[in-house]
Amino acid sequence: RGQRVRMVEVSVITAAYNSAGVIERNIRSVAAQSLPPKEHIIIDDGSIDDTASVVEALRSEFPYVRIISQSNSGAARARNAGIAAATGRFVAFLDSDDTWSELKLATQIGFMTDNSVLFSYGDYQDIDTATETVLGRHEAPERLTYSDLLRGCPIGCLTVAFDQAALGKHFMPDVRRGQDWGFWLQLTRDGTVGRRYPGCHACYHRAGGSLSAAKFSKAVDIYRIYREQEQFGPARSLYYLLPHVVGAWTKRPVRYDEG
């Protein structure tokens, strides 16, 4: 199996904005994978710091790293630029301030190829950016269908990979928040079932601060996805929006001292 997995081509997509202080950690996290990617595409979304120069300086060490520069347009357009450029069979996402364990790609892609899975995700840790301490672990469901995803998004983008050779090119809806969830809806609408790969191999580095305004804006964008992408009427859109709103205010990671 190991040799077969090593022959699989993976494109890693990283959206970056003013990430000069963290992008090297991200690049080295991908470089440390026991299953090396075919390419690591970094989209500099109009940064006004030294993000691009840090990436360029590392390209001699990691020649498979590619950088795409664009005016500031948001995460959806940045990731879409990466998807458009991706040439690997599998596409995986890792934003600039997040990291993976060395076994993430090998575990995930091995699981997908062994089980004919086209869309997969996994658990991830919350890391406090200021102290680098582990806050807890987000546990993903074993399976996700389109119907499940209509009621919420219980997975993290940093854990996801999909088989673009089988599913084709798909692009995220052009909203500032919730674009990844809208993308998972696209991947599963035809009956494709998402599956959880084993272990916990991703780390989400969380900054502090109030998220109240962000949660309201995200709710608006989620409503737009129901209306514009899924073509639901107002009443049906509001019906499905409610679990998102409740979840946004109650969701928290499983903390290790809770078992």
Question: Which stretches of residues belong to each language-model region?
Answer:
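Cell-envelope/extracellular polymer assembly enzymes that use nucleotide-activated donors
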Residues: 8-11, 39, 182
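Short, well-formed alpha-helical segments that are part of the catalytic scaffolds
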Residues: 18-32
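A conserved acidic beta->alpha catalytic loop
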Residues: 29, 44-54, 71-73, 95
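Glycine-rich, basic loop-to-helix element that forms the pyrophosphate-binding segment
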Residues: 70-86, 107
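Short aromatic/hydrophobic "clamp" motif used to bind/position activated sugar donors
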Residues: 91
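Conserved donor NDP-sugar-binding/catalytic core segment of glycosyltransferases
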Residues: 103-134
